[in-house]
């Protein structure tokens, strides 16, 4: 299994449609995306024996929030994008349970992308982060563990409104 990677490649072509120009990606060794609660890869404990591998996520250990909702995404058509939104309060751990995809994160100032391709690693994404999921390999299954029940009022669906609030909060 390959490991998850972080890349600082230019992302201007990945800006949400109709959105303002994308912020510059952070330079190597630069500040992580997420001004107060940085996005980060979380290593998940794995236990392997002749019966297979068990991967664990515990509240208070691997993640510092209670899981109030979980969902998975699968069967994403080739070339399609998921996400294209931000959250006001919600925190989440995103895991590629099978296959791979990239998550582009944007806090209104910095932008980066994470490749998720190992079920033993997840991406923590905190509040006030715009996210896009792209590059789904055939057969990919992604799992989201989230801190809040679904509430449409908690979402940013408009990138310019997200940018306004994200930049005003800093």
Could you say what each language-model-derived stretch is?
Residues 118-123, 128-135:
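Well-ordered alpha/beta subsegment
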Residues 1-5, 18-121, 138-141, 145, ...:
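Non-catalytic, conserved peripheral segments adjacent to functional cores
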